[in-house]
Amino acid sequence: MSVDTSVRLPGMPVKNPVMTASGTFGYGLEFAPYGDLRSLGGIVVKGLSLAPRLGNPMPRIAETPCGMLNAIGLQNCGVEKFLRDKLPRLPWRETPIIANLYACDADEFAELAGVLSAEEGVAALEVNISCPNVKAGGIAFGQDPCMAGKLAEAVKKRAGDKPVWVKLSPNVTDIVSIARAAVLGGADALTCINTLTGMSVDIRSRKPRLANVIGGLSGPAIKPVALRAVWQVCQAVSAPVIGVGGISSAEDVLEFILVGAHAVQIGTANFMRPDMAFRIAERLPQLMAELGIEDLASYRGSLRVG
């Protein structure tokens, strides 16, 4: 049986829905020894800021049951070095490269979008709205609908013809209100979800396992939360949703598409097996054929409720 794994996202058709999640796949080059980067639907590089960042002190990762905590602190080489040294070595003509943006205020986000707007090798911009807004007392952009909407608008104005994705935080009371505000502000697509806030402690040393004390929980433990969030957001907005959270198999991919996602991102599973994203992309068409799914468009959002 012949199947069609292609997906159309705003401004870019992709060969399959399997992408990588920011912060779990480096800049893409680090994983080239484990598979063909051209086989992926998209590569979302680790968060980029205007200036290089050293990140948080060690330890920055702690294993948890069914997942992991991280407090990397968005360590990165800075956008200029990425564009000069890393982007030219990526297969951007065959696989869309999505730049994930990190900044401390809306003006900085907009400036970063402007730097990337003319780069031919960058297919889209993903905005990390879990960042604290220093001009608003440190509250995260993603925790306030008004701030989320204004940030999406500010980035969209400077993004040129680049599609803008807004990555939603699950650490909110009502993720749907944030999603709606982001779309009204100009977001072309939504990435759903970022990590959940968590912590881990050592009862013998009486110390936290992370130097930052609190970190972001990811991995299989958060998949039910991510599925619920994607389902709710897809019911509320017309913009495409990219699902992320605990995905480690082709079956997981289809679960997210079943509840409405257009595409998915593989995150923590890349630490379990560095070839995981490649394996899932290879397995997906086989699974679709086994289940009699001819194309993803007809399967998307077909969950039978009631």
UniProtKB/Swiss-Prot annotation:
Gene3D superfamilies referenced in this protein's UniProt entry, alphabetically: Aldolase class I (3.20.20.70)
Enzyme Commission number, as recorded: 1.3.1.14
Catalytic activity, reaction form: (S)-dihydroorotate + NAD(+) = orotate + NADH + H(+)
Chain positions recorded as FMN binding sites: S22, K46, G47, N100, N128, K167, I193, G219, G245, G246, G267, T268
Pathway listed: Pyrimidine metabolism; UMP biosynthesis via de novo pathway; orotate from (S)-dihydroorotate (NAD(+) route): step 1/1
Compartments, as annotated in UniProt: Cytoplasm
Record: residues binding substrate: K46, N70, A71, I72, G73, L74, N128, N194, T195
Keywords from the named record: Cytoplasm, Flavoprotein, FMN, NAD, Oxidoreductase, Pyrimidine biosynthesis
Predominant subcellular localization, coarse grouping: cytoplasm
Needed co-factor(s): FMN
Keyword NAD: yes
Molecular function as annotated in GO: dihydroorotate dehydrogenase (NAD+) activity
NCBIfam families: PRK07259.1, pyrD_sub1_fam
Function according to Swiss-Prot or TrEMBL: Catalyzes the conversion of dihydroorotate to orotate with NAD(+) as electron acceptor.
PANTHER family attached to this UniProt entry: DIHYDROOROTATE DEHYDROGENASE (FUMARATE), DIHYDROOROTATE DEHYDROGENASE (QUINONE), MITOCHONDRIAL-RELATED
Oligomeric and partner information: Heterotetramer of 2 PyrK and 2 PyrD type B subunits.
Protein name: Dihydroorotate dehydrogenase B (NAD(+)), catalytic subunit
